[in-house]
């Protein structure tokens, strides 16, 4: 007897007009998470999730593709305006922001929330190349 095929349930549309885009740009990858005002995740994407591997993940183009993907998923839920919080030293910061604006979102504010230690933990040893 053949098993019935499992039905794929489509996510319900959330109808959230404004939200916050968190762009975490490290030296190795760029992650974009779009949340509502309370911090509940609406959509997310990263350079690695878009199929880039190794050193290609850290490129501005990979960040742009990831931001376009996260923006497309968020706009399916009816999102129109965004506040952008950028953190980290990576090369994908500006290109991710530009891609979010090009996707048709109105960016109301841009904040840099990169954490800077006030002499906290001891840093790892310097790389000698």
Swiss-Prot record:
PROSITE patterns (alphabetical): RIBOSOMAL_S11
Highest taxon, organism lineage: Bacteria
Swiss-Prot/TrEMBL keywords: Ribonucleoprotein, Ribosomal protein, RNA-binding, rRNA-binding
SUPFAM superfamilies in UniProt: Translational machinery components (SSF53137)
A GO term from the CC aspect: ribonucleoprotein complex
The keyword Ion transport appears for this protein: no
UniProt-listed GO biological process terms: translation
GO molecular function, one term: structural constituent of ribosome
Disulfide bonds: none
Self-association and partners: Part of the 30S ribosomal subunit. Interacts with proteins S7 and S18. Binds to IF-3.
Family that this chain belongs to: Belongs to the universal ribosomal protein uS11 family.
Function according to Swiss-Prot or TrEMBL: Located on the platform of the 30S subunit, it bridges several disparate RNA helices of the 16S rRNA. Forms part of the Shine-Dalgarno cleft in the 70S ribosome.
This protein's name: Small ribosomal subunit protein uS11
Organism listed in the record: Methylorubrum extorquens (strain PA1) (Methylobacterium extorquens)
Lineage, uppermost ranks: Bacteria, Pseudomonadati, Pseudomonadota, Alphaproteobacteria, Hyphomicrobiales
Gene that produces this protein: rpsK
């Amino acid at each position: 007897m053949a098993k019935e095929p499992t039905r794929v349930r489509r996510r319900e549309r959330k109808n959230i007009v404004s939200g916050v885009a968190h762009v975490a740009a490290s030296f190795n990858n760029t992650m974009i998470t779009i949340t509502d005002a309370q911090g509940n995740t609406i959509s997310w994407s990263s350079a690695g999730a878009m199929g880039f591997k190794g050193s290609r993940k850290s490129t501005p183009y990979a960040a742009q593709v990831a931001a376009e993907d996260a923006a497309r998923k968020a706009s399916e839920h009816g999102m129109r305006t965004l506040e952008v919080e950028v953190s980290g030293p990576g090369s994908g910061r500006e290109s991710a922001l530009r891609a979010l604006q090009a996707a048709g979102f109105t960016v109301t504010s841009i904040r840099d929330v990169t954490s800077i230690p006030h002499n906290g933990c001891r840093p790892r040893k310097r790389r000698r190349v």
